[in-house]
Amino acid sequence: MANERLRTALLERGTTIVEVAEAIEVDAKTVERWITRGRVPYRKHRFAVAKLLGVEEAYLWPEAMTPAQTAAVSETEIVTVYPHRWAVPKDAWGRLFASARQEIDILVYSGIFIAQDTGIVRVFADRADAGVKIRMLLGDPDSPEVAQRGIDEGINDGMAAQIKTALVFYRSLRRHENVEIRFHRTVLYNSIYRADDQLLVNSHVYGTFASNAPVMHLRKVPGGTMAATYLNSFDSVWDQARPVES
């Protein structure tokens, strides 16, 4: 059976079979068989192709790894777990964002602790100046989802107020061509803070502030699916969100 996922990935990337073969140092006919006959490459070749095309190895060849192997690899994506967000070292946030060379993604309701940190906002500006694409998703302050989250945390209208305050702190960033901020109307189960292949994921626990909920530090690795799950979630929310008006 043909590997349509691999074929589509090549088309979307604008890459030819010959170019893939040359890049990973195999015969072009070998790559063609991977596509037309569904042959599964060796692990090192799967990794090289996935990296070249910018997609997940597990997406291109989902049958290549057993569930146990996928689970074992995904476990290595967990760098550490903090019992509470306040237990994350203060400088860890700045170091995470400063490490970005390609993209920074943030999915929150207000993320006010980030917006109020002048040092981190400066890091955002510096990274944007360096060509890093920054996407921020804030809760729509007029949405029922934000209103309910405010009730759940016991601050009622305070959640919407925090979002509006965060926008004030981001005023200068919003004018940068590499920064885009959107409003979402999503029931969040996690807040996501991403810099390239690293993520800090803050779970949301009913009846408590996000600052008191656990945080996972993840690093995406080839063959793992945990980090990819959160990144796909971010993209889904982004696609449904609306740009914040200037």
Where are these regions (language model features)?
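HKD (HxKxxxxD) catalytic microenvironment of the phospholipase D
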Residues: 179-218
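Recognition helix of helix-turn-helix/homeodomain-like DNA-binding domains
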Residues: 25-41, 63
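PLD-like (HKD) phosphodiesterase/transphosphatidyltransferase domain
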Residues: 69-146, 231-236, 243
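Short C-terminal boundary/hinge segments that cap the last helix of small helical domains
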Residues: 54-69
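HKD-type phospholipase D/PLD-like phosphodiesterase module
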Residues: 140, 146-190
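Key DNA-contact positions within bacterial/archaeal DNA-binding proteins
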Residues: 18, 29, 58
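A short, Lys/Arg-rich alpha-helix, primarily the initiator
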Residues: 1-19, 23
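Short, basic-rich loop-to-helix N-cap that marks the start of a DNA-contacting helix
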Residues: 37-51
